[in-house]
Amino acid sequence: SCMKGEKYLFVVSGPSGTGKDTVVAKLLGSHPEIEKTVSATTRTMREGEVNGKNYHFLTKEQFETALAEGNIVEHTCYCENYYGTLRSEVERHMEQQIPVILVIEVEGAGNIKRMSPGSTTIFVMPPDMKELERRLRYRGTEAEEVIQKRLRRAETEIARSADYDEHVVNDVVDTCAEEIYSIIQKRIAEPDAE
């Protein structure tokens, strides 16, 4: 059953290297009425970061308590730190009817959809595998085996992308951002679930 306000929830996902963060940043820059969830993390605050703006900074104990109490809707562990989405962050947007984007890994997207069937999942595709490989290499930070692993994972994720409500191809960032914007506009214009 859909909770009221679930139509304001948008999950953007896709393989590593598709540029989903860049596309969402572009979208938020052009359309300030749309927001993005602020993730919770246990990593140390960096200089210039603001608690509650860049991240909600939690201790490992706080994060694990929130997790145990069901107050974190999806999370991942990266470089020995937790990153996750707070339930309160999602619910606030639903209550206030503010369209909100969660940019998350493919594995986390299914969890959100199960929790909020009224949410919209959007899969960001690379133009093709060659381009994805080029983008992963362009970063110049990863070892060859890491790149190969990510490409294999991307193929698996793309193969499973049929489960998503919407698909967009990130060829030109601006175009892709506007495509997502029109998906959001169309969805929030639909009548509320009773």
Summary of predicted features, one role per range:
Residues 2-7:
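Phosphate-binding P-loop
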Residues 9-11:
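Short hydrophobic/aromatic beta-strand immediately N-terminal to the Walker A/P-loop
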Residues 14, 19:
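Conserved glycine(s) of the Walker
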Residues 21-71:
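N-terminal phosphate/diphosphate-binding loop that engages ATP/GTP or pyrophosphate donors
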Residues 37, 56, 120-122, 166-168:
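Hydrophobic/aromatic beta-strand patches that form the interior of the parallel beta-sheet core
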Residues 61-71, 85-140, 184:
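ATP-dependent NMP and nucleoside kinases share a basic, alpha-helical "lid"
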Residues 73-80, 138-145:
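Flexible beta-alpha connector loops of hexameric P-loop NTPases
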Residues 118, 134, 138-142, 156-194:
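NTP-dependent small-molecule kinase module
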